[in-house]
UniProtKB/Swiss-Prot annotation:
The keyword Transferase applies. It catalyses: 2-C-methyl-D-erythritol 4-phosphate + CTP + H(+) = 4-CDP-2-C-methyl-D-erythritol + diphosphate. PROSITE patterns: ISPD (PS01295). It holds the Pfam family IspD. It is an enzyme of class 2 (transferase). PANTHER family: 2-C-METHYL-D-ERYTHRITOL 4-PHOSPHATE CYTIDYLYLTRANSFERASE, CHLOROPLASTIC. This is 2-C-methyl-D-erythritol 4-phosphate cytidylyltransferase. One of its GO terms (biological process) is isopentenyl diphosphate biosynthetic process, methylerythritol 4-phosphate pathway. SUPFAM superfamilies: Nucleotide-diphospho-sugar transferases. GO terms for molecular function: 2-C-methyl-D-erythritol 4-phosphate cytidylyltransferase activity. Catalyzes the formation of 4-diphosphocytidyl-2-C-methyl-D-erythritol from CTP and 2-C-methyl-D-erythritol 4-phosphate (MEP). Pathway: Isoprenoid biosynthesis; isopentenyl diphosphate biosynthesis via DXP pathway; isopentenyl diphosphate from 1-deoxy-D-xylulose 5-phosphate: step 2/6.
């Protein structure tokens, strides 16, 4: 299976002056934990890291002794553009691809393998987790307008897996129609293509704020105790 890791993050919400993926977490950069899990996943054979040139050297330094191919791909100005460039950088033989946010550094090898095996059946999928909070829909004035049925709500995460040709077609449609999406599954929704959810468990958080870093540190400490 081919894996693209989106690594063109910023440190704005962290209050940092550099890519949040290079901030320290339990003695290593955040993205080092993401790469460690991906490299340990049995079903991942090739990894493409999509990022900005300024981060190329420090990120590639983390995988100098990798046990499988790791390729750098220059990212774009948005996540959507970066994924499109990542797709262009895949090996010609790639038929299926997993796309993962570098900031989801608590993803374990087993999650990558589960997603890879599920994708091998042909169905597009996303890692996700059932919503446990009561969600409110509000208007522009902050007034509640609706309470969606929680049993139907899942928080979308990554990895997300797709057939390469179909995902390329989806991005071509997005460019032609001026669509802006925050994840690739949204393209499939707009085009009426089915996407399955795969329960990722509670720990697959995205490190975005200083609080998230503290949570990730605690989770990693617990794992080391086990």
């Amino acid at each position: 299976m081919h894996l693209l890791i989106a690594a063109a993050g910023s440190g704005r919400r962290m209050g940092a002056d550099r890519n949040k993926l290079l901030l320290p977490l339990a003695g290593k950069p955040v993205i080092a934990w993401t790469l460690k899990a991906a490299l340990a996943a049995e079903h991942i054979q090739w990894i493409g890291v999509v990022g900005q040139e300024i981060d190329r050297e420090p990120i590639l330094d983390l995988v100098r002794d990798a046990n499988k191919p790791v390729t750098w791909i220059q990212g774009g100005s948005t996540r959507q553009e970066s994924v499109l460039r990542g797709l262009a950088g895949l090996p010609e033989a790639a038929e299926q691809v997993l796309i993962h946010d570098g900031a989801r550094c608590l993803a374990e090898p087993a999650l990558f393998d589960r997603c890879a095996m599920a994708l091998a059946s042909g169905q597009a999928l996303i890692a996700a987790t059932p919503v446990t909070d009561t969600i409110k829909r509000v208007d522009a004035d902050g007034v509640i307008t609706d309470t969606p049925d929680r049993s139907e709500l899942w928080a979308a995460q990554t990895p997300q897996g797709f057939q390469v040709d179909q995902l390329r077609h989806g991005h071509a449609e997005a460019e032609a129609n001026g669509w802006t999406v925050t994840d690739d599954a949204s393209l499939y929704e707009r085009l009426g293509w089915p996407v399955q959810v795969l329960d990722a468990g509670p720990s697959n958080i995205k490190v975005t704020t200083p609080f998230d870093l503290n949570v990730a540190e605690a989770v990693l400490a617990l794992r080391q105790q086990d």
